[in-house]
């Protein structure tokens, strides 16, 4: 069936009181950005729902994009017909016949914005329900939890019918929850944490630490490719590449082995906080899960967090690895995350890192290096890339094959 528009329903936005207008405006902007490649599409965000007028665009492709827009609870592809009862009946029947399977139940749900229309909601429900019962053998009416709800909206500019309700991404529109930076490695966890941050409306800039020649160009490309996939939920993302080689080499040379990881993490967090301040961000997200690795014990977190007063947000804190992997698979980042390119978090990992580092010793050993000078050099060398959903940085088949040779 050729649809004329997609009717979008809000989720949490309905509870936002006086701020609801701002949330709806942001959702409208995000939806337009997500659908920018489709010529002729019109997006109109209203108080109770958002309407996407297709004007001939491919409804299936548009709906695939809408599934990734945070703030959308669900949506329905709709057909517009004239305010003529015969046309309404014919379209309603065609919709039901397209979906119907033996034993299916249904109901009609009518809303009437145009109070001048000749039939009220109850009358229209009866007319359409009776017509479908007469023409679809075996179908039954069920008012509570039917298999099919045929929605009919009588508006001023026509009648709109829909027979499907497709689940959206939920959450809040990206941009309504403020701005933060995300410490993005090439692993499984940090992209999932970024997904959860954006789902709560936070606009994220990705901070990635790059340590050539110890980390490869493929590792950098993988991080950018992960960002491109995450950009599908926000339209575009700023990717901030921070050189970290000299800092890691200096730490390895001057800091006791057991504290290498702790001091590296302290410097990473210092740099992330500095980037956040430069970009007027109010927090730092990471992919830490309590107890998962040595740097993610409470003692390690305390020793590392010591370097900044900026909020450190950990969406995955209480999640098991199996739960995180399941989400990564669902958001299409898992296959990239497991590609065998080491990031800077793994290349200088000591054989026996401190799982319970002492805070005072951490402060002491950090003074063995020129923190300010190393940080300034890294910040001066950072590179910013604007990444969009369709950008491609990694030919996976070629690179994986090359890795195996």
From Swiss-Prot:
Protein's organism: Levilactobacillus brevis (strain ATCC 367 / BCRC 12310 / CIP 105137 / JCM 1170 / LMG 11437 / NCIMB 947 / NCTC 947) (Lactobacillus brevis)
Pathway: Cofactor biosynthesis; thiamine diphosphate biosynthesis
PANTHER family: TRNA SULFURTRANSFERASE
Originating gene: thiI
Designated name of the protein: Probable tRNA sulfurtransferase
EC category name: transferase
CDD domains, per the entry: PPase_ThiI, THUMP_ThiI
Gene3D superfamilies, A to Z: 3.30.2130.30, HUPs
Example of a GO cellular component annotation carried by this entry: cytosol
């Amino acid at each position: 069936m050729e649809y004329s528009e997609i009717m979008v329903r809000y989720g949490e936005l309905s509870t936002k009181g006086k701020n609801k207008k701002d949330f709806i405006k942001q959702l409208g902007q995000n939806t337009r950005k997500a659908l920018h490649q489709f010529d002729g599409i019109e997006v109109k965000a209203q108080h109770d729902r958002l309407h996407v007028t297709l004007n001939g665009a491919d409804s299936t492709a548009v709906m695939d994009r809408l599934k990734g827009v945070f703030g959308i609870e669900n949506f329905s592809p709709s057909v517009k017909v004239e305010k003529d009862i015969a046309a309404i009946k014919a379209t309603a029947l065609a919709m039901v016949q397209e979906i119907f399977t033996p034993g299916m139940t249904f109901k009609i749900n009518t809303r009437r914005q145009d109070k001048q229309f000749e039939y009220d909601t109850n009358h229209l429900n009866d007319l359409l329900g009776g017509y479908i019962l007469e023409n679809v053998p075996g179908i039954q009416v069920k008012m509570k939890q039917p298999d099919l709800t045929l929605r009919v909206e009588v508006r001023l500019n026509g009648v709109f019918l829909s027979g499907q309700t497709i689940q959206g991404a939920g959450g809040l529109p990206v941009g309504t929850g403020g701005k933060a930076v995300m410490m993005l490695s090439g692993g499984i966890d940090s992209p999932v944490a970024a997904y959860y941050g954006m789902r709560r409306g936070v606009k994220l800039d990705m901070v990635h630490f790059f340590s050539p020649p110890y980390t490869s160009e493929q590792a950098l490309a993988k991080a950018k490719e992960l960002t491109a996939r995450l950009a599908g939920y926000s339209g575009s993302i700023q990717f901030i590449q921070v050189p970290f080689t000299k800092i890691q080499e200096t730490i390895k040379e001057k800091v006791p082995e057991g504290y290498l990881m702790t001091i590296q993490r302290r410097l990473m967090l210092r740099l992330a906080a500095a980037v956040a301040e430069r970009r007027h961000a109010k927090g730092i997200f990471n992919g830490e899960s309590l107890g998962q690795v040595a740097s993610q014990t409470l003692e390690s977190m305390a020793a590392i967090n010591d370097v900044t007063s900026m909020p450190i947000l950990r969406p995955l804190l209480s999640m098991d690895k199996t739960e995180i992997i399941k989400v990564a698979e669902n958001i299409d980042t898992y296959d990239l995350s497991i590609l065998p390119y080491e990031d800077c978090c793994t290349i200088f990992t000591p054989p026996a890192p401190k799982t319970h580092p002492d805070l005072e010793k951490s402060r002491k050993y950090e003074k063995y290096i020129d923190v300010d000078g190393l940080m300034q050099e890294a910040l001066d060398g950072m590179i910013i890339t604007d990444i969009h959903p369709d950008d491609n940085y990694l030919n996976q088949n070629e690179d994986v094959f090359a890795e195996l040779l």
